[in-house]
């Protein structure tokens, strides 16, 4: 029986995957032009284009699973059934504590995915899950500064309710970024807000996303797949339209 009375907060070291979504391209700065060059990775990655799939499943585990490290670990086939049961749940609505699916033998998703990496990668699905999403229609329309301000405010409200907002990061019509992350914390700063995020491309540490109240824009610092700078944010997996 789940005796959870106070909803626990997302913890990167416990609630993220032990493996990363691999990058197809390596992003390198050009010393002459200052621009970022894209160089194909060699050897070709075996597990890429799964960012949307990974953030979706990470949230499903946070919303619908309870890990029980004090119980005997389930067999591989039993773990597969548990994995599928979690993935069959809503990605948008959290279940009641007593309805959570118990995952025995592990303290959290990180250790579960470390032990059953191959199984979990297979069950999360192929790269197509990152391309065929109902929310992708939004990226072709302009993102106004007022819209981005409202989005930032809505994200703060969601985090205050212990939700895990999933964001689609875009720079449309440029194709320089098409990525998904999860937010799990926010800090008020002099310039605006600094959000703490789980980026499925990074299994080592959490990352940051800033919102500048002056420019009314989101700013993502440079990382393995982005040279740094302003981009647009769409809050997805939150309604029947997203």
Language-model segments: residues:
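Weak global preference for isoleucine
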Residues: 6, 93, 101-103, 120, ...
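Short alpha-helical interface elements
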Residues: 79-87, 180, 208, 222
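Cysteine-nucleophile protease catalytic domains, especially the papain-like/related folds used
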Residues: 6-145
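Cys-His-centered catalytic/binding microenvironment captured across papain-like cysteine peptidases
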Residues: 1, 174-178, 187-242
């Amino acid at each position: 029986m789940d005796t959870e009375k106070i909803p626990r907060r997302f913890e990167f070291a416990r609630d993220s995957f032990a493996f990363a979504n691999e990058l197809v391209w390596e992003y390198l700065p050009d010393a002459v032009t200052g621009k970022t060059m894209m160089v194909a990775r060699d050897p070709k990655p075996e597990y890429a284009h799964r960012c949307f799939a990974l953030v979706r499943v990470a949230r499903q585990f946070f919303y619908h699973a309870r890990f029980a490290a004090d119980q005997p670990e389930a067999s591989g086939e039993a773990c597969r059934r548990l994995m599928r049961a979690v993935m069959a749940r809503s990605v948008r609505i959290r279940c009641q504590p007593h309805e959570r699916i118990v995952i025995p033998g592990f303290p959290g998703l990180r250790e579960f995915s470390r032990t059953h990496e191959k199984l979990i990668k297979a069950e999360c699905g192929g790269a197509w899950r990152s391309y065929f999403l109902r929310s992708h229609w939004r990226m072709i329309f302009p993102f106004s500064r007022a819209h981005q301000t409202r989005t930032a405010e809505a994200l703060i409200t969601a985090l205050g309710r212990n939700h895990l907002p999933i964001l689609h990061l875009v720079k449309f019509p440029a194709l320089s970024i098409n990525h998904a992350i999860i937010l799990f914390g926010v800090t008020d700063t002099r310039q605006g807000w600094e959000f703490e995020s789980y980026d499925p491309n990074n299994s080592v540490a959490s990352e940051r996303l800033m919102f500048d109240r002056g420019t009314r824009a989101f700013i993502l610092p440079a990382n393995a797949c982005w040279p740094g700078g302003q981009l647009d944010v769409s809050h997805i997996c939150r309604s029947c339209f997203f």
